[in-house]
Amino acid sequence: MSIWAIGDLQGCYDATQRLLENIRFDPSQDTLWFCGDLVNRGGQSLETLRLVHSLRSHSVVVLGNHDLSLLAVTVRSEEEQRKVNPDLLRIITAEDRDEILTWLRMQKLIHVDRTIGWMMVHAGLAPKWTTQMAEKLAHEVEQQLHGTDYRKLLHSMYGDKPEWSPALSGCNRSRAIINVLTRMRYCTPRGRISTEDKGTPGTQTQGMYPWFEVPGRVERDLKIVCGHWSTLGLTITQGIHAIDTGAVWGGKLTALQIDTDELRLAQVHGLSIEHPRHTHTPRRKAKKRHKRSPK
């Protein structure tokens, strides 16, 4: 039996199939952890969703920002729905859309397996969040998303503010939690997120840190696997395992076996698309980062 965590698929169906062949995935005994962003940009989002849906008894999914955006589209007017990109439009107009999208909406924001000592989240955790606190806050939003009033959440979740505070309530609280779990790359020690900084460490605004390098962050009792940050590339450091390696931007699709003492890595080539350049001018010297070799 093996447990493999897989980075952002982003509609790269062919690459996903090749990766499953590469790791010799056996649904009778193996489990897949998908780090979110199953859809968008890759051109085969419908096929990718159908594939992951077919593996639902043998996999765990956490939602990414693109998955939530797709769900948000479904509660808009038909006229607005027709304005989405062709890849997502194929999902919205598919005969099995209700089954697939209902299943997608029922997925988690965080997955924890304390037996093996791992947590999976799409983007990251706020500096002061313990793993237990992150689970609790994620569950707050999951209850809304899985409930009958989910449309209210999907209508109100967009926006860069407010920054997280325990005193928040209502829509503002849910939005802040979603932004941390699905959109964060850089933040301040107080937890304020930068949504503009998307490049590699060293290109960010002064005062911003990669979320896993923020001074004074709490110690965490679980190893974390995440995706979302394609320009960061494969990064294993300080208990963080970032595995979005830009499959949709001409990079690779990555799988990481996490249930063994020695981590195993598998990769296949993604699409041949140039990654967008982020030209934010550096305002501070980047802190040197040390990657740990897989143990």
From Swiss-Prot:
EC top class named in words: hydrolase
Compositional bias ranges of the Basic residues kind: 277-295
Keywords: Hydrolase
Protein's name according to its UniProt entry: Bis(5'-nucleosyl)-tetraphosphatase, symmetrical
Region annotated Disordered, chain positions: 271-295
InterPro entries xrefs: ApaH, Calcineurin-like_PHP_ApaH, Metallo-depent_PP-like
Family: Belongs to the Ap4A hydrolase family.
A Pfam family: Metallophos
Documented EC number(s): 3.6.1.41
Annotated function: Hydrolyzes diadenosine 5',5'''-P1,P4-tetraphosphate to yield ADP.
Organism of origin: Xylella fastidiosa (strain Temecula1 / ATCC 700964)
